[in-house]
């Protein structure tokens, strides 16, 4: 279904107020609440696009070619400035970063751009007169896993470490350009990292392994494990992990077609295994019992990749989660601390017309 609609990838901006859609027909930019298309780059301008990344709600967009009819190479990141007034639309391409291998992901903040390849990560100053500040060798990272703290106070970068199942954290503000920083590693899982995310302040990192049954949260300063959340018992591929803006909740989506919502601020809201009330159990069962299960969940099309994030709070006791799927569907659910979860909105974002420039 994703191929029918031609969606190659989806990504939220830094505060999850917008998302960009890389397509066989170009790029579309959407506002989340209310849902509306804010702009697009058509196929004549950019060809088919594999990846796109937004810088907050600005006019700057990073694109990487790919798909069936690309105009641009998969080894280049192009920066598109939609606010630039030019006669030829091609002149809106203001920057280009080119490498020797395919670009797998791009992350941006107000002063830096991060470009992720399979075995290397590059950090440049951005957007004025970009200069390469750092490069980091990584273990095989075929999904281009990486997250960057958007906070003005903290310049934290996280990506899979050299050791299987580990996370590497780099404070870009404490690292001198051209030098390699001392490794700051968290041994998070026994198998390969499959998904990771930082909260908005960069104080907590969440990760899941390829097994996909557990999500573990760590303090980025002390490296201590804070909590272990159980998505389920069957292996799954996690597509996305996101924190609420105040880090009170966490949501996660997987190929099981379920979006799980966990409480972080008040973990007593999360469900526990019935065995937790039994008392002492063996070490293997004990790990299962000690885990916290989601306080609420909802379903989206199974095996359809989707990204999820928290919406605007409608009241003190009502929160919302947005799920955006590559099949073109938009889902909004509201949930309460007692675990009630109900659909509030459903739409097909690919059928929404252009509203404005972005």
Curated annotation (Swiss-Prot):
Keywords: Autophagy, Lipid-binding, Repeat, WD repeat
Pfam families per UniProt: PROPPIN
SUPFAM superfamilies from the UniProt entry: WD40 repeat-like
GO molecular function, one term: phosphatidylinositol phosphate binding
Motif, L/FRRG motif: chain positions: 229-232
Domain notes: The L/FRRG motif is required for recruitment to PtdIns3P.
Record-given protein name: WD repeat domain phosphoinositide-interacting protein 4
Protein encoded by which gene: wdr45
